[in-house]
């Protein structure tokens, strides 16, 4: 590399010599250029005295140039601040220059893969979310704060349970069976979505969403679904600063659409359908319980306290924070408590050698409410079934109990059941990243980084013997799991410039990862005392299992080359080769690469007259590949496993056929982007993309004869396309000393289409999902019978058959593709921020459109007789009752089926955050609301489900928070 630089430098010097200015008052200047950081000589510094007169510094940082008196010498080098010195007739003859490292302001820095770049110099598609979008959000994790912030990033919560993470998708779903989540990188280390709540949002400095191949390809086989890069805070002040942040809040259900019968309606319904025999309605009518209010807490408390210390000097940089977060769930039996400690430290040992460590410790107490399944005892589900004249409380406010007969309903009181069957988890988490960085010569950086990610999770459930249904015999279960992930990376980065126009940056790297997990669970029964309901007091063990040890390893080599010319033309090339233990020996390695180009139109000479108008004008193009390896660890191997026991002896049998030819899933992405800035006030980003997934990793159904009894086998089959457009607008409409006003808007449209399945198959119905995979159709499209209404003459339900003719028979063969998918093609957000002196007001909305879900709750609530002994929707009072009635609910006894009647528009617009704040001299006081308003046609408790079927879901919470 040095020889290459020397040759270029010599050629530059030779050409420059021919154009060196000559005059009677010429001054010869020479000297050495060094770095302020380490005192080392700088190679390749451009020393310019005007057009055609310039030299480059040598390997020792030396330069010599002859210039006319009165000339301004300009010293410039990539990564350093430019320096200018005026040369007079009196000299100086010897001019040694020290260049200061160019420091990026936080707002001008863009975090990319394995580095940081200045805003406006990146060819790839990268969206940045800064800390001010996260720091005051009253959530245990950062994921909720991203909703509606980035075009092309869909964030949906599958549950409102406090410890749960959201589901994120970047530019559409790219695979049918393998993983669809982005790769999450925190301080250079990959984490899983389950660890979101281990990161205090206030510890985050910035997040970058990498969307195209140019920005993600260097992550190779893990980046097909995009990458989210998270950087935690560092000390940036010269002297130590101490800060405190506290929040107190209250939560309630955010949407809560509830149409189940009250007592008067229930009594009317029972009389109409013949369930009134033996009922004392005079007595029952005195009780009217809204089970939504009985089960869900409208005053669930939240509190958060954080203290941090940060500072920096020439040699030391540190950030230390400690936090406590406690949130009660709005559903009973759910809560989240976290203790966190972060320590980020960097130390410059010598001028050339630096070390650092980023460590995060975390302890959590978690209670999770059962959801997603229909039972008569778990409160979220049971609330829909309980009759309104069954009171879960006694007159004194205590729980009505099956033990003393105060519970008058059928079965068990769900709230009492929960109190007698607690389930708790504890999680211990440690993530530590250490690095050594060496700069043997100027502009050359060698870095080695190692990380250890360890978690230990325990679960403990009890069922007390004093609870009457247990008949005096308790039970207890404990589970334990351990996971550790070791990662190491080594990189070499060299950057230099030739003259003042050509800038180069080269990166070479190697990474390795090893992952291991193991665990067990055991259940014991026979305890006779509530206080002793534990495994050690069981009289017998009734269930046990040892989770099979799971291991995974990965090895990678990668590189990136960047070039820019005169701040006008930028080019990037990246390449990565990955080897994974998840694939067979025939296809263990995969190679991925990408190119990117960016044209900075504003810096063209012919655009000089437009610069007052165009603060930014850039055109970018990228194309390349990335991969997906998100499948179980051993699918390429034929496996045997336990099949239970026979006469007290254990037994094993083949459980998986294996596939040694299993290989990587590939995604080829092409991206075209236009970035415009107008009057330094309005910024517009417009992007088009096309992503094609091939060799999809799918669990392929096998015929019995071909599979030797195995039903499925993983294979590389099928293809899928995602095409879309994104728009992001940020406008600083007013920027005055005492008043400012900002508007932001983003929207993304993604069209998904399956282009190939497996073995010539063009369609395949997915069991228990009401969806079907069909070539030419989008993933997630519903496959249902079409409900046609009710025959007003006799009250029969009507459907359309496959040919569009009316029928009163519900037949599976009449299902059709509906043209409606669970995956929303449209998503986005918009917001505004106003400031008057020290008072500020901000609002942020998020939305998705053309998204559909099956409302499974209605299958039970509107059963029309199938589940009539339990509470039903008040809509059943509007069912068909006599000839001539026009309604969409059939006569009693015509049961509800899974048809298009249950398919609902789950599009929504949500006021995600509203904040009013006042900045005092040394602190900031604010009040804010989360999920304050929801606009939707969906009839369930919440439209934000992350599944194609909505069933007994834990709804999102509305929060009011006071913060300091």
Each language-model region and where it sits:
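Hydrophobic beta-strand positions in extracellular immunoglobulin-like domains
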Residues: 33, 99, 436, 494, ...
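Glycine-rich, aromatic-lined ligand/substrate-binding cores of catalytic
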Residues: 822-854
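Surface-exposed loop/interface segments of Gram-negative outer-membrane beta-barrel transport/assembly proteins
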Residues: 105, 120, 236-289, 330-334, ...
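Extended, hydrophobic alpha-helical segments in both membrane/secreted and soluble proteins
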Residues: 204, 341-343, 448, 488, ...
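Transmembrane beta-strand segments that form the barrel wall of outer-membrane beta-barrel proteins
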Residues: 246, 322-328, 571-580, 621-623, ...
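Repeated loop/turn-to-beta-strand initiation elements of outer-membrane beta-barrel proteins
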Residues: 315-318, 352-355, 443-446, 568-571, ...
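Short, small/polar-rich motifs associated with maturation and membrane association
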Residues: 1-12, 16-343, 347-362, 404, ...
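Residues on the lipid-exposed face of transmembrane beta-strands in outer-membrane beta-barrel proteins
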Residues: 232, 307-311, 341-347, 432-438, ...
């Amino acid at each position: 590399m040095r020889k290459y630089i020397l040759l270029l430098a010599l050629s530059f010097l030779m050409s420059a010599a021919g154009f060196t200015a000559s005059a009677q008052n010429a001054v010869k200047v020479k000297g050495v250029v060094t770095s302020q950081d380490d005192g080392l000589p700088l190679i390749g510094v451009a020393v310019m005295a005007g057009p055609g007169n310039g030299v480059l510094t040598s390997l020792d940082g030396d330069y010599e140039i002859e210039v006319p008196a009165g000339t301004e010498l300009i010293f410039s080098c990539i990564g350093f601040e430019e320096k200018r010195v005026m040369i007079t007739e009196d000299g100086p003859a010897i001019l040694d220059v020290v260049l200061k490292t160019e420091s990026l302001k936080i707002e001008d820095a863009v975090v990319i893969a394995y580095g940081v770049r200045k805003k406006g110099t990146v060819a790839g598609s990268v969206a940045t979310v800064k800390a001010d979008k996260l720091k005051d959000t009253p959530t245990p994790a950062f994921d909720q704060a991203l909703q509606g912030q980035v075009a092309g990033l869909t964030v949906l919560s599958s549950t409102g349970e406090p410890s749960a993470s959201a589901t994120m998708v970047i530019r559409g779903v790219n695979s049918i069976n393998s993983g669809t989540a982005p790769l999450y990188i925190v301080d250079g280390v990959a984490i899983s979505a389950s660890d979101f709540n281990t990161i205090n949002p206030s510890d985050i400095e910035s997040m970058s969403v990498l969307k195209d191949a140019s920005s993600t390809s260097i992550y190779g086989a893990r980046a097909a679904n995009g990458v989210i890069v998270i950087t935690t805070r560092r000390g940036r002040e010269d002297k130590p600063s101490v800060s405190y942040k506290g929040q107190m809040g209250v939560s309630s259900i955010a949407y809560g659409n509830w149409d189940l019968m009250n007592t008067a309606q229930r009594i009317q319904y029972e009389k109409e359908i013949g369930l009134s025999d033996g009922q004392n309605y005079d007595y029952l009518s005195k009780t009217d319980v809204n089970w939504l209010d009985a089960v869900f807490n409208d005053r669930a408390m939240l509190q958060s306290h954080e203290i941090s210390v940060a500072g920096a000097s020439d040699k030391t940089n540190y950030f230390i924070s400690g936090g406590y977060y406690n949130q009660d769930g709005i559903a009973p039996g759910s809560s989240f408590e976290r203790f966190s400690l972060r320590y980020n430290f960097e130390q410059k040992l010598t001028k050339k050698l630096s070390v650092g460590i980023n460590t995060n410790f975390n302890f959590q107490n978690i209670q999770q409410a059962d959801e997603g399944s229909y039972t008569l005892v778990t409160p979220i589900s049971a609330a829909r079934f309980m009759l309104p004249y069954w009171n879960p409380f006694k007159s004194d406010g205590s729980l009505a109990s099956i033990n003393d007969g105060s519970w008058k309903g059928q079965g068990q009181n769900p709230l009492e059941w929960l109190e007698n069957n607690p389930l708790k988890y504890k999680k211990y988490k440690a993530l530590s990243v250490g690095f050594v960085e060496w700069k043997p010569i100027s502009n050359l950086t060698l870095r080695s980084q190692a990380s250890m990610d360890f978690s230990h999770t325990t679960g403990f459930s009890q069922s007390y013997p004093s609870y009457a249904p247990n008949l005096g015999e308790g039970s207890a279960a404990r589970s334990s799991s351990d996971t550790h992930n070791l990662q190491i990376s080594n990189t070499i980065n060299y950057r230099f410039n030739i003259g003042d126009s050509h800038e180069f940056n080269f990166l070479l790297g190697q990474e390795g990862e090893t992952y291991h997990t193991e665990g067990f669970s055991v259940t014991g029964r026979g305890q006779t005392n509530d206080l002793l309901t534990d495994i050690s007091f069981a009289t017998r063990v009734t269930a046990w299992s040892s989770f099979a040890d799971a291991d995974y390893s990965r090895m990678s080599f990668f590189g990136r080359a960047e070039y820019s010319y005169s701040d006008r033309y930028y080019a990037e090339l990246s390449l990565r080769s990955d080897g994974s233990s998840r694939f067979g020996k025939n296809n263990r390695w995969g190679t991925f690469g990408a190119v990117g180009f960016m044209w900075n139109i504003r810096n063209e000479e012919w655009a000089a007259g437009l610069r007052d108008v165009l603060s930014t004008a850039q055109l970018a193009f990228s194309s390349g590949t990335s991969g997906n390896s998100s499948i179980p660890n051993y699918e390429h191997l034929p496996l045997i496993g336990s099949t239970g026991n026979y006469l007290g002896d254990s037994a094993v049998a083949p459980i998986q056929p294996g596939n040694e030819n299993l290989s990587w899933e590939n995604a080829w992405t092409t991206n075209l982007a236009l970035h415009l800035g107008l009057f330094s006030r309005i910024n517009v980003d417009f992007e088009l993309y096309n992503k094609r997934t091939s060799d999809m990793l799918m669990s392929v159904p096998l015929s019995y004869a071909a599979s030797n009894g195995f039903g499925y086998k993983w294979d590389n089959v099928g293809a899928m396309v995602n095409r879309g457009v994104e728009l992001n607008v940020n406008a600083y409409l007013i920027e005055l000393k005492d008043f400012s006003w900002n508007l932001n808007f983003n929207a993304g449209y993604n069209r998904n289409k399956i282009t190939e399945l497996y073995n010539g198959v063009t369609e395949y119905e997915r069991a228990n999902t009401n969806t079907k995979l069909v070539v030419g159709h989008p993933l997630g499209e519903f496959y249902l019978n079409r409900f046609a209404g009710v025959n007003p003459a006799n009250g029969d339900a009507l459907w359309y058959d496959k040919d569009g003719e009316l029928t009163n028979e519900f037949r599976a063969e009449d299902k059709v593709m509906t043209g409606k998918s669970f995956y929303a093609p449209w998503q986005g957000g918009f917001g505004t921020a106003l400031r008057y002196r020290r008072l500020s007001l901000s609002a942020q909305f998020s939305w998705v459109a053309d998204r559909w879900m099956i409302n499974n709750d209605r299958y039970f609530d509107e059963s029309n007789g199938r589940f009539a002994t339990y509470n039903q929707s008040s809509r059943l009072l509007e069912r068909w009752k006599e000839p001539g009635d026009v309604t969409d609910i059939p006569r009693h006894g015509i049961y509800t089926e899974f048809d298009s009647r249950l398919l609902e528009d789950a599009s929504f617009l949500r006021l995600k955050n509203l904040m009013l704040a006042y900045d005092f001299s040394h602190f900031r006081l604010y009040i804010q609301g989360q999920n304050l308003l929801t606009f939707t046609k969906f009839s369930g408790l919440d439209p934000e489900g992350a599944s194609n079927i909505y069933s007994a879901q834990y709804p999102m919470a509305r929060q009011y928070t006071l913060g300091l």
